[in-house]
Amino acid sequence: MGVLMSKRQTVEQVQKVSLAVSAFKDGLRDRPSIRRTGELPGSRRGTVEGSVQEVQEEKEAEAGTSVVQEESSAGRAAWERLRDGRGVEPEEFDRTGRFTPPAFIRPTRKLDDDKPPEICLEPREPVVNDEMCDVCEVWTAESLFPCRVCTRVFHDGCLRRMGYIQGDSAAEVMEMAHTETGWSCHYCDNINLLLTEEEMYSLTETFQRCKVIPDCSLTLEDFLRYRHQAAKRGDRDRALSEEQEEQAARQFAALDPEHRGYIEWSDFLSHESLLLLQQLRPQNSLLRLLTVKERERARATFLARGSGSTISEAECRRAQHSWFCKRFPEAPSCSVSISHVGPIADSSPASSSSKSQDKTLLPTEQESRFVDWPTFLQENVLYILAARPNSAAIHLKPPG
C-alpha cells in the first residue's frame, strides 16, 4: 500500500536534498586544489615520505586560505540571507526539535499587473481567517494567532519551533494578536518580501556600490552618507539639496522612535524596499498588493472620514498619518509599541488631538477640495503597506 505524503512533507524532502547537494558543492568549491605539473627527477611520489610531504602541502594551503574564508564567510552569509528574503539568524540558535522554514519564492509580476484592479467602495468584502495553522496545517481547539494583514493563523508552539518567537515574546504576541492593534506574521512583517527577483537584484546592487553592510545598524551619519551616494549613482554630479537632506534626517528620526541614535537593519531594509516599490511600480501594481483586510480598513476609514462617495483632501492627508498612530496596549506586561494598522476612532481623545495638530499643519484650502475613492486608495496605498511591520518605526514618513 502506497504512502501518502502531504504537500509540506514533499517540500521538506526537496529542501533536504537541495541542502545536501549545496553542501556537497560548497565542499568541492572550498577544497584547495594542488596543481602538479610534471614530476621532477628524484620525486618521492608514491613513497611514505612523498605522502607525508603531500599532507604537509595540503595543510599549508588550507592554513593560507582559512583566514580569507573566515573573513568572507560572515559577509557572504549576510548577502545570501538578504537575497533569499531571510532575516537574521543567530549563531547560537538551537535547531534541535525545530521545524524547517519553507523555501521562499519571490513574487513575479503578471502581465495585467499595471491594469486598474477592481476595488469598489461597495459592497464590503468579507474577511475570514484560515481555519488551520499555516505551519502544521492542523486544526486544534487551541488559540490561534491571526495575522492582522493576511488571513493566516498560527499556533504558539509552531511559531516557537520555527524560531519566529523566542523567550518571553510569545506573551507579547498573544496580547497583540487579539487586540485592535494586531500582530503581523513573518510573511507580512518583512516588506522586502514584496520585491521581485529583479527588484531585489537592483536593491542589492545599490547596497554593494554604496558599501552598505547587511544586518548592521545605521547611525544618522551612515544614513545620510548612503542617501548622498545613492543619489549620485545615476548622475555623479547630482547631490542632495539641503531640503532633501533635512527630509532624510526627519525620515531617520521616524525610523528611530526610541531616540537610540541608530536604526535597525530590518527597519532600514523595509524603508528602502518601499522607496524602490514607489520608484518602479505603477499605482495599480501597488494596489494589487493590498490584502482583503487592508482594503476593508481603507473602506472603513474612507466612510468614517468622508461624506458619501468623496472625502476632503485634508482628511485624505490625515488618513496617511493615521495608519502610523501608536496604540500602547493596556496590559502593563507588554512594553512593545506596535504601529497601528488602521486609524484611531474619531471619538477617541487621541483622534481629536491629532486632528487639531493636523489642522495647523495642513493649508485651509485643502478643506474645500475633495477626492474620490480610487484617488484615496492611490494616495494611501504606500502608507498602508508601510504600516505592516510590527516595529514601532515609521518606515515611510508622510509629508507634512
Curated annotation (Swiss-Prot):
GO CC list: cytoplasm; nucleus
Residues found modified as Phosphoserine: S43, S51
Zinc finger extent (PHD-type): 129-190
Record key words, sorted: Lipoprotein, Metal-binding, Methylation, Myristate, Phosphoprotein, Zinc, Zinc-finger
Ranges for region Disordered: 30-108
Underlying gene: PHF24
Gene Ontology molecular-function annotations: transcription corepressor activity; zinc ion binding
Listed Basic and acidic residues bias regions: 78-97
Keyword Phosphoprotein recorded: yes
Protein name: PHD finger protein 24
Lipid moiety-binding residues (N-myristoyl glycine): G2
SUPFAM superfamilies: EF-hand, FYVE/PHD zinc finger
InterPro entries: EF-hand-dom_pair, KIAA1045_Zf_RING, Zinc_finger_PHD-type_CS, Znf_FYVE_PHD, Znf_RING/FYVE/PHD
Modified sites of kind Omega-N-methylarginine: R36
Organism field: Pongo abelii
Residues the record lists as Phosphothreonine modifications: T47
